[in-house]
Design a protein with these regions (language model features):
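Structural motif corresponding to alpha-helix initiation and N-cap regions
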Residues: 7-8, 63-64, 122
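Short secondary-structure boundary segments
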Residues: 81-83, 141-142
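Alpha-helix boundary recognition
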Residues: 14-18, 71-72, 130
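Charged, gly/pro-rich active-site loop segments
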Residues: 1-5, 88-152
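Short beta-strand segments
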Residues: 19-62, 68-70, 76-80, 89-91
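Amphipathic alpha-helical interface surfaces
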Residues: 10, 66-72, 92, 104-108
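A generic structural signal for nonpolar/aromatic side chains embedded in well-ordered alpha-helices
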Residues: 14, 69-70, 112, 139
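Extreme N-terminal tail/first-helix region
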Residues: 1-22
Length: 152
């Protein structure tokens, strides 16, 4: 039966495999929305009163539209959905923080690569994407809307 997800269900949905691609909305300089696909990982170590599921972490090149947008305007929204019955989704609104720290960048690029491409390709993905010019982005949730089993 359709129901609103609790925080643990949200975290499990975001971490489930096979990994789903998120749809990230950022704000262009002229105020128009920009939506782009992102691979992400959930950092449960950041769970707390101000982040009940933890931060959503992804990387992007600083020169991309989303990279430029979020360094200027940190408000973001991310939607992750299940496109097969019984259909579920999580939408997260929040604020981004950006880092260019090389160790953090390599770590998260490797984690994300393993999540989407498999453990055997994680290091290669990390080495290719954990480089200067890339950003580590942490989306700290301020609002989460999530429903499970919508077609039941």
């Amino acid at each position: 039966m359709a129901h609103a997800m609790d925080d643990e269900e949200v975290a499990e949905f975001l971490e489930s495999l096979p990994a789903r691609t998120g749809k990230l909305a950022s704000v262009r300089a002229d105020g128009r929305p920009h939506v782009a696909p992102v691979w992400y990982a959930l950092d449960r170590s950041t769970r707390g009163p101000d982040s009940p599921v933890g931060d959503i972490v992804f990387n992007t090149a600083s020169a991309t539209v989303k990279g430029r947008n979020l360094t200027r305007e940190p408000r973001l929204a991310l939607c992750v959905d299940d496109d097969a019955p019984p259909f579920s989704f999580v939408t997260i609104e929040g604020t981004a923080t950006v880092s260019e720290d090389p160790d953090e960048l390599l770590h998260w690029a490797t984690v994300i690569g393993g999540r989407y491409m498999g453990a055997d390709q994680a290091d290669a993905y990390g080495a290719r994407n954990g480089v200067p010019g890339e950003l580590v982005v942490r989306l700290r949730p301020t609002r989460i809307t999530a429903s499970a089993r919508l077609a039941d």
